[in-house]
Regions:
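Primarily recognizes the serine-hydrolase "nucleophile elbow" in alpha/beta-hydrolase
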Residues: 106-193
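Conserved alpha/beta-hydrolase "acid-adjacent" motif
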Residues: 207-216
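C-terminal catalytic histidine-bearing segment of alpha/beta-hydrolase fold enzymes
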Residues: 41, 215-271
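Extracellular beta-sheet/turn segments enriched in Thr/Pro/Gly and aliphatic residues
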Residues: 345-376
Length: 376
């Protein structure tokens, strides 16, 4: 029995976009290795949420791992309503990484220029990359521009700034890595307060790109006040992609979805501020949490910490607020003590929870009045 794959079984992209239809700048020849492009992978129309991600396969700026770091990632994103665009960027030794960056920036401009066609929100376009592709995503995130308003090419008038970046086991600084400093420019040194928020993934076991490359960029983002989340898994070789064979490391795509949701990147509706109060027997809780979990699976969760010193009042700022509509409200009461001391005394044997359905309305207060027996 033959397991060979025939030519008509090889997957073909939905749609291909040449980055420069009339020829790429600095091209050293013709053919696939000299003609950068995007393959377009769109979710079902009814499922699309307006978020778009450009996917950069890795390969050390020499090859492109286009299956498990390209197509398969795009199809996974599509399952969650996210439009995906796999980038074929030019690689060495023919092309320096400055040309790869030129291709990636052009890809962002091209996607943004056709946002209406692809039902995208121009403020929710990100870049996800693996290894060298992750370095490329960070280079774009730290070197974006607003476009050239005077350019004859309308695509060049578009911004190359991404709204978020996802570097996965990425090189972030070649010099500090100790290899190929000329190819892997120091992205950490280019981080500034305008750098896009980042979701960073790495593994401790990576013997090709050490996990210190991930902490390097995270520390730079932290210093600059840029929103970032870092996950370093113990297990996992370099190049795991979505990590289909490792149930633990395979949690990172799920964590990414949660991060995108929490940042409001999976919803087109505007967030709102929520002000209100929580009292139990007309008294504020010592310490607790108020959490708003939306009925819509892709709307962001909102929450705030409750402290007795606020007299039961709370405010969730618009930036971190919910989207109007139906939510499950949870109040977690974790201590009757508003201020711990050195006595080590206990006030609650376990955290207590109250839950109910609420309808969030912009500008309307959320005042909750409870009794101790309402908690479980």
């Amino acid at each position: 029995m033959s397991n060979s794959i025939t030519s008509d079984q090889i997957w073909q992209p939905d749609h291909v976009l040449a980055l420069w239809p009339t020829g790429a700048p600095q091209a050293q020849g013709s053919g696939v290795l000299h003609e950068p492009q995007l393959t377009v992978h769109l979710p079902p129309v009814a499922q699309a949420n307006g978020c778009g991600v450009i996917v950069n396969p890795g390969g050390g700026y020499r090859i492109l791992a286009s299956d498990h770091e390209g197509l398969q990632v795009a199809r996974w994103l599509n399952q969650y309503g996210i439009a995906a665009f796999v980038l074929r960027y030019r690689v060495g030794p023919t092309y320096p990484t400055s040309v790869s960056l030129l291709d990636a920036q052009r890809a962002v401009r091209l996607v943004r220029s056709r946002a209406q066609e692809f039902a995208l929100d121009v403020n929710r376009i990100g870049m996800l990359g693996f290894s060298a592709g992750g370095h490329l995503a960070l280079a774009v995130a730290t070197k974006g521009d607003q476009g050239d308003a005077q350019a004859e090419d309308p695509i060049e008038q578009q911004s190359s700034q991404v709204n978020f970046a996802v570097p996965v086991y990425a090189v972030t600084n070649g010099a500090k890595r100790g290899r190929k400093a000329d190819e892997y420019t120091p992205t950490d040194e280019s981080v500034n307060p305008q750098t896009a928020p980042c979701f960073i993934v790495h593994t401790h076991e990576d013997a090709i790109v050490p996990a210190s490359q991930a902490t390097l960029i995270y520390d730079a983002l932290l210093r600059a006040g840029v929103k970032a989340e870092l996950h370093i898994f113990n297990d996992g070789e370099h190049g795991v992609g979505l990590a289909a064979g490792d149930p633990d490391v395979a949690e990172w795509p799920k964590l990414l979805l949660r991060w995108l949701r929490r940042r409001g990147l999976l919803a087109h509706e505007e967030r709102c501020a929520v002000r209100g109060s929580v009292l139990c027997a007309e008294q504020p809780l010592g310490l607790g949490w108020l959490t708003l979990i939306p009925k819509h699976a892709q709307h962001p969760i909102a929450r705030t910490f409750l402290h007795k010193r606020e007299g039961g009042e709370f405010l969730i700022a618009k930036e971190n607020g919910p989207i109007v509509g139906q939510h499950t409200l949870q109040i977690h009461w974790i201590s009757q003590q508003a201020q711990y001391d050195g006595s080590g005394r206990y006030s609650l044997e376990r955290s207590l929870m109250y839950e109910c359905a609420v309808d969030i309305v912009a500008g309307q207060r959320l005042d909750i009045r409870l009794q101790a027996h309402d908690f479980v």
